């Protein structure tokens, strides 16, 4: 958020699973994902993001330049939100899950909504990501192509999952830097110029 704010954006990082508990209470990421994040219904998250957009529009944000980005779980949500909100102008999903099992809380995966995108989406993925197989990335590419969707997926061959997380061993500086530049260009191209 800070880095986007320094670029001139009104950037907000909402706590989208606060109703389910405190993420700080979980010892590691796998436990956090299964014990907290998986309990949050997609419909609740999308509604909360609508409320964030509404709040931003009343507090200095330009609803005509609404954009979203997210990482990992947030990357998956980014794809879903691009199909949910018709006001969205641009989206960038960083290594978000594309395919998988459906549940009551997650009735659709990004591959299921490729035909419904309201905004151009840039997907940034690691070729060495063990949690998102390249087969699922290719399945998403095919779905986007078939839908004639305005979307692009970039795969960084030497990067794994969470390659932009500079506080984790998975950080891959070259891919992270390139991905960040691509995100800024995507936002500029589709979301409009900064103030």
Q: What residues fall within each predicted segment?
A:
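N-terminal cap/leader regions of alpha/beta-hydrolase-fold enzymes
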Residues: 1-195
């Amino acid at each position: 958020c800070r880095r986007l704010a320094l670029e001139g954006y009104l950037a907000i990082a909402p706590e989208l699973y606060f109703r389910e508990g405190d993420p700080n209470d979980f010892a590691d990421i796998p436990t956090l994902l299964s014990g907290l994040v998986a309990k949050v219904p997609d419909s609740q998250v999308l509604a909360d993001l609508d409320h964030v957009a509404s709040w931003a529009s009343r507090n200095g944000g330009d609803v005509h330049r609404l954009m979203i980005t997210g990482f990992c779980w947030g990357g998956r949500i980014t794809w879903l939100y691009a199909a949910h909100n018709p006001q969205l102008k641009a989206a960038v999903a960083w290594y978000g899950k594309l395919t998988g099992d459906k549940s009551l809380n997650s009735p659709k995966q990004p591959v299921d909504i490729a035909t419904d995108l309201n905004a151009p989406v840039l997907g940034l993925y690691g070729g060495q990501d063990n949690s998102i197989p390249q087969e699922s990335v290719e399945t998403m590419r095919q779905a986007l192509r078939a839908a004639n969707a305005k979307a692009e997926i970039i795969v960084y061959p030497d990067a794994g999952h969470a390659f932009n997380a500079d506080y984790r061993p998975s950080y891959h500086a070259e891919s992270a830097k390139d991905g960040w530049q691509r995100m800024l260009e995507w936002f500029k191209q589709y979301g409009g110029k900064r103030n």
